[in-house]
């Protein structure tokens, strides 16, 4: 049995869960090394505390590898939920991951005996995925190195001054491929001027003009692991207000990163950056959490926010991305990924955070 599944079983035992239904393809791949995109069909990895694990798979899907667990095949004419229920008749507490569709869960509850208890069990896998092993860390470091190189190319394109937000964003896929990345990890954000005040702006036909801020928020995947970073630069000139806001956000980023080490609460890291920006005169203008966890998915369980008081542990990887957004004028965000080490953290992005005026 692999170490990852052993760690999940330990979490199940701690929570009194004897059967765990996992439907998230990313988590199934993480645990058994099998990739599948089931669409609307039932796809379940059932973990049992006795070690007798089973994968439920529609026979339309292709399996070309040996898996060290039971495989139950079903077809479209079978009642797949009834098939699954036969493996839960002795269950006392069934954990369900947060992705499983109600169209499967609700009928399953009718098939199993009335004494079976169901509860949200995602944390059993989520907690294990929060802490990256050495191989995962190496892949995420490489993904961030690719991102550093790619954002340099993106900023050079912006400096030309003759491409719209959308045109620059559309160049990124080719840049990533040339650097050895698999794909985007999310749709990139390229925003100019007042559009930078929209934290999730969708690139359009806006063109640059002197004095505009430029936000580029982008990420790639490398061998299944994600990167994510943001830099803000300025086109041709920068005002004193823009300079002050940029330095405030950049220094908030640095201050938060400086306190990261095992034992520090994630909410206190958020507070560090938020208080720093508040002292600079901005409260409502910093309108999102400080960061999110990342790995196989660009947004994984856990965040760096006022409401998440978990303590940092070695091997965790998350973003630090303070921002100030002044509606109708401009916005600034600076984002790195950090890897928690034994006594601090490693910043995975090396691209400069000095104030840059391009073009």
Each model region followed by its residue ranges:
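Active-site neighborhoods and metal-handling regions in enzymes and metal-associated proteins
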Residues: 1-359
